Regions:
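Nucleotide-sugar-dependent
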Residues: 792-796, 810-825, 839-844
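Short hydrophobic beta-strand element within catalytic cores of glycosyltransferases
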Residues: 808-809, 828-829, 833-836
Length: 908
């Protein structure tokens, strides 16, 4: 591809390599889209269709004329966008090769107009430079491919849906413009039929069904794009309809950019529709705001690379499109998508220099019921802490049209199936029944919607008639938002008891759900989870279901069940794998998905940043060192994605030596940046909180004080009694053994404490020190039994050392920069008193378990002289009493509550 054809599409990221997040400017987005299509089509041609000579078979399926038509159509859009060569050949030449070999007799409807409109780009039929080199037979074949006039009889006989009038109108209008149609009355008649169809509903929403059952879906919006070439003939109705389509998708847009997430033909096509609507919005000047529509198109475009491999769509791999778009139409779907994106790029070219708002700005709170007509047909649209979600109440009885919540990546259902999810399923005889079709009524209030049906119906059809219920009764569903979750209550009252009744909730492997069921009295129920990973029938448009949560009731006519579903919080931590982070997260269990760091030079590039709900920052210096510009880029990206940040402020500045060797003060700007950005900051003491705020500012964050947890879960099982530890360490007996453990710190005055021991007159004291700096030596004194440089040891060794001690010493400089030390929590867990300096952290954390001894050698010597057994016993009892305060289970529960609150705060 030439440099003029393909421009850098944007920064490379882990979520869509090598394309990255698309550019925000509409002009650059147009180039990005066109480049993406050119790259994909080139790859497809090079691998499977050199020179435009399509194969006759693709992965076991015959290649039909629809592929020829769609490839020519896509190339026509690229040509209009300025692409003259592709895969080393002129676009004109490839299109000519395709049309010369097309099977005209088997090309019809959608593919007829695509051939005709493509040919029209080169001018009228006579003297058309594209067709001139073809022989008479080939030209006749192309003319036949453009002609679907015989289908008009099927439309007259109502064998085809009424909206096929638009398809045939495009066919005949293009033929008339080519000069292949003599009687314009045919076009006029078809255009009038199109107007009749579009004007049928005063709300401008298309019911795409044959029987008028209220099948509102992706085509409810798409029909207005499809009829754009007819807009001049349709009149003002068309622009009103486009405005309605845009208003609908402004409400139904999913977090992944899918325009309409229920019904048929969504998934990859749902993303493409959003891009198309963004282009149409700019071209025609309708929609809420141009910059917001560019942002919507950009959001959808960012996911497009994930729908393709080697130029071919992945919509059939590990997921499924609708049945009529099965693997036998894989190439056609591929080119259908490319054609839509190429068209959108051309439209965006006309409206330059509109810059998208940040993606997070699209995430404004929403709670709205969109009515499709004067019946109860509607869709409930919500956007909040649980993401964007829709619940449709429409016609058709296949799985995709039932009133299950849809939020791609979180709430998905099987494609084109009789597997009904989130709704009651009752079996009578061999037939299953559920709530299908438009409800009798739908009521909406703040944060909730209620729907009622007159019973349950059997069958799972795309276009069946809506007859009386097979199981009469009254069935009500009540949906309401609850934080990040969704609560659904079902009241079922049937005239006849089925032999079985159940509910099913599918779950993706990468998006665990916390599911709770409850039944109100009799009958009793049974909950279960079933692994279905790899079972084809459980595939959705976007993924495959990993497991199904199911709840069955004993046979009954009447039932009331409550369903509570909350997506597991996806947490990325800058300390992933560190023992502090492990100790914090493990007690949270299934409430979180624990993900590695996803930002900065140390990031795990396999982590999808768009699949993160919250970022937990620990030590900023280990995210991007002292590179302030990189820290700023990370902060901006978090903000653009709307990912909140919780920061545990372990320090005021990094420990020395810092990761880069720079002095700790060099990181002040980095710490201030994160203090301004963070949504919550965790401190381990109130005094630490006050010092942090005084130095770095409060920002807009919640400042919360939570204790430092102890690490006893890592070493408790290795503890032994004191005498055993004494023997294993080769220590002589002592009445009072004081330990110094933990890594050296500038503020940790180990030498002063040891000098104090050497200066005191007590003979019953023994000190064991494993905390010296490498360049530090201890006084020569027989009471200092061990004086070793710090080395990280395993859990068993650490437990052995604690077991040998009667107290731990904490000789920290009260005026230093440290905010906390985890060894204090270990002292509490081990039931050991702390011999403490005047450092404020020690007194607040240890309480009565702290024995003041100062930090200078003279202070330590004097304090040791005064220390008696009663003091130590009282401090030991106080340490044991404080264990509940430092248990990670409690710290984790309080931290998890903070996580949830921070996510909710984003939507306050």
């Amino acid at each position: 591809m030439s440099d003029t054809t393909r421009r850098n599409p944007g920064p490379t990221g882990p979520d869509a390599p090598p394309w990255g997040w698309p550019p925000a400017d509409s002009s650059d987005l147009a180039v990005w889209l066109r480049s993406f299509v050119v790259d994909g089509v080139e790859t497809l041609l090079d691998r499977h269709a050199p020179g435009g000579r399509l194969p006759r078979v693709f992965a076991g399926h015959a290649v039909e004329p629809d592929v020829t038509a769609d490839l020519a159509y896509t190339l026509g859009h690229l040509r209009r966008g300025g692409v003259e060569q592709i895969a080393g050949a002129p676009v004109d030449e490839i299109v000519r090769t395709l049309l010369a070999g097309i099977d005209g007799d088997r090309t019809h409807t959608f593919f007829s107009y695509r051939v005709a409109e493509t040919v029209l780009q080169w001018g009228p039929w006579d003297d058309n430079p594209l067709l001139d080199p073809l022989d008479d037979h080939e030209r006749s074949n192309v003319a036949t491919a453009c002609d679907s006039s015989e289908w008009i009889e099927l439309l007259d006989a109502r064998i085809l849906p009424r909206n096929y009038a638009a398809v045939l109108a495009r066919c005949e209008l293009a033929r008339m413009r080519l000069g292949l149609l003599g009687d314009p009355a045919v076009v006029d008649d078809l255009l009038q039929r199109v107007v009749d169809v579009l004007a049928d509903n005063p709300l401008h929403h298309l019911d795409d069904s044959v029987h008028g059952v209220g099948r509102y879906d992706i085509y409810t919006a798409d029909v207005w794009l499809f009829t754009e070439p007819l807009a001049d003939h349709i009149g003002p109705l068309w622009l009103d309809g486009l405005r309605t389509a845009l208003e609908l998708v402004e409400r139904t847009l999913a977090d992944d950019g899918t325009a309409v997430a229920w019904g048929r033909s969504t998934g990859s096509l749902g993303a493409a529709l959003t891009v198309e609507l963004a282009a149409a919005s700019l071209r025609h000047g309708v929609g809420d705001a141009p910059d917001r529509w560019v942002a919507r198109g950009r959001r959808a475009a960012a996911r497009l690379p994930g729908w393709f491999t080697d130029g071919v769509t992945d919509a059939h791999r590990h997921r499924s499109p609708y049945g009529y778009r099965g693997p036998f139409r894989r190439l056609q779907l591929t080119l259908d998508l490319y054609g839509k994106l190429a068209w959108a790029a051309n439209e965006l070219d006309r409206h330059r220099d509109t810059v998208a708002v940040q993606d997070a700005e699209l995430n404004t709170p929403l709670d709205e019921l969109v009515r499709f007509d004067d019946t109860a047909a509607s869709v409930w649209c919500t956007r909040g802490p649980g993401g964007s979600n829709v619940v449709p109440f429409v016609g058709a009885t296949r799985s995709d049209y039932l009133c299950a919540p849809r939020s791609p990546g979180t709430y998905e259902v099987p494609v084109d199936s009789e597997l009904a999810c989130w709704v009651p399923v009752a079996v009578v005889g061999e037939h299953r029944h559920t709530v299908t079709g438009v409800p009798v009524r739908v009521d909406h209030g703040p944060g909730w919607v209620t729907a009622e049906w007159d019973g349950l119906r059997s069958g799972a059809e795309l276009d069946g008639e809506h007859g009386p219920p097979d199981l009469p009764g009254t069935v009500r569903g009540h949906w309401r938002t609850a934080g990040r979750g969704l609560h659904v209550d079902w009241d079922v009252d049937l005239d006849e008891a089925p032999r079985a009744m159940w509910w099913s909730v599918p779950e993706r492997a990468d998006r665990p759900l916390q599911v709770q069921w409850r039944t109100d009295g009799a009958p009793t129920g049974r909950a279960d989870t079933v692994l279905v990973d790899g079972v084809d029938e459980w595939r959705s448009f976007w993924s495959r279901t990993h497991r199904v949560h199911q709840f069955e009731l004993d046979p009954t006519r009447r039932a009331r069940i409550e369903l509570r579903v909350t997506p597991t919080l996806r947490l990325s931590s800058s300390a992933h794998g560190h023992h502090y982070h492990r100790s914090l997260v493990e007690p949270m269990g299934d409430a979180v998905v624990d993900l590695p760091l996803a930002w900065g030079p140390l990031a795990d590039t396999a982590v999808d940043r768009d699949a993160i709900d919250l970022f937990h920052l620990h030590w900023p210096e280990w995210v991007a060192f002292d590179d302030l510009a990189e820290h700023r880029r990370i902060v901006e990206d978090l903000g653009a994605r709307g990912v909140p940040t919780v920061w545990t402020a372990h320090n005021l500045t990094p420990h020395a030596p810092t990761p880069t060797g720079a002095p700790p003060e060099a990181f002040d700007a980095v710490y201030r940046l994160w203090a301004e950005h963070a949504d919550a900051v965790i401190h381990h003491t109130h005094a630490g909180r006050d010092r942090f705020v005084a130095r770095h500012g409060a920002g807009h964050a919640r400042h919360v004080v939570l204790p430092h947890g102890d690490f006893s879960t890592l070493w408790a099982e290795h503890r032994v009694d004191r005498s055993t530890a004494e023997q294993r360490l080769g220590l002589s007996p002592a009445d009072l053994r004081i330990g110094l453990v933990g890594a050296p710190r500038t503020e940790k005055l180990v030498g002063e404490f040891l000098e104090g021991v050497a200066a005191c007159g007590r003979a019953d004291v023994q000190v064991v020190c494993w905390s010296l700096r490498d360049d530090e030596t201890a006084p020569t004194d027989p009471r200092i039994a061990i004086a070793e440089p710090y080395r990280e040891v395993d859990e068993a060794t650490y437990a052995l050392r604690l077991s040998a001690c009667d107290a731990l010493a904490f000789p920290f400089d009260p005026d230093g920069g440290m905010q906390a030390t985890g060894t204090v929590a270990d002292a509490i867990a081990a039931g050991l008193p702390g011999l403490c300096s005047d450092w404020w952290f020690l007194g607040e954390s240890l309480g009565e378990a702290a024995v003041p001894v100062g930090h200078a050698a003279t202070q330590v010597a004097a304090a040791l002289e005064r220390l008696d057994g009663d003091q130590l016993a009282a401090a030991r009892s106080a340490a044991i009493a404080r264990r509940e305060h430092t248990r990670w289970s409690d710290v984790a529960a309080r931290t998890l509550a903070l996580y949830e609150q921070v996510v909710l705060d984003r939507w306050a």
